[in-house]
């Protein structure tokens, strides 16, 4: 049976309405009744500001052959790339967020703490309806050094025993995994180890329902699957 509360997250916003990771794409996704939140990517501008961008360069989406790290936040804004602060200010605290760090960005920690920080029942700093995720060990260790009690997800291609052990060693609460690498046995291994799981990136409703039925915390979706 599906666990209650499985979240449907828009992968980089709603690409059908606007370029990925743009403020317009984020707002369009959250206007869809079936959308519970967002997954988006964070990089650092040349002046240390956390911005929403997946690739190292602007070539693919913005058609601009420049690296994110060489442009200021103001310059990036000219190409429709918003800051994390702008996005969090626009969407409020209700949507769930999977914030994927592509690199260590101190500005991301500071803005998340300001906009989504809270103290849990045990008196520990945590995040309100948000997690920080990454594929890279060094980034997850960096986040743990910065904010040890914040929830972290390891992004991975499978739920193998090695991946589970790696997530546990990093102190992650869950693994966000390519849906192709998910089956009942793998999920059982993760749950037995005390880890939750999320799935990416699902593009049809049948796959969404299958992963949901296995007990996913969240499913990262695109296109028509966002509509439910």
Which functions belong to the PLM regions below?
Residues 1-228:
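Phosphate-group recognition and catalysis centered on beta-loop-alpha active-site segments
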């Amino acid at each position: 049976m599906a666990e209650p509360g499985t979240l449907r997250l828009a992968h980089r916003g709603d690409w059908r309405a606007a370029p990925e990771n743009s403020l317009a794409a984020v707002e369009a996704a959250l206007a869809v009744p079936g959308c519970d939140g967002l997954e988006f990517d964070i990089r650092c501008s040349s002046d240390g500001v956390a911005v929403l961008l997946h690739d190292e360069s602007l070539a693919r989406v913005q058609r601009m052959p420049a690296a994110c790290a060489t442009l200021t936040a103001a310059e990036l804004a000219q190409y429709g790339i918003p800051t994390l602060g702008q996005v969090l200010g626009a969407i409020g605290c209700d949507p769930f967020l999977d914030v994927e760090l592509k690199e260590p960005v101190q500005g991301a920690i500071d803005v998340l703490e300001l906009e989504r920080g809270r103290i849990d029942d045990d008196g520990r700093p945590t995040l309100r309806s948000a997690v920080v995720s990454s594929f890279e060990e060094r980034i997850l260790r960096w986040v743990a050094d910065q904010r040890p009690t914040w929830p972290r997800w390891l992004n991975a291609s499978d739920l193998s025993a090695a991946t589970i052990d790696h997530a546990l060693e990093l102190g992650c609460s869950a693994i966000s995994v390519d849906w192709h690498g998910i089956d009942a046995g793998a999920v059982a291994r993760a749950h037995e180890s005390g880890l939750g799981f999320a799935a990416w990136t699902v593009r049809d409703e049948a796959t969404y329902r299958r992963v949901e039925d296995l007990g996913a915390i969240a499913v990262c979706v695109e296109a028509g699957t966002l509509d439910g």
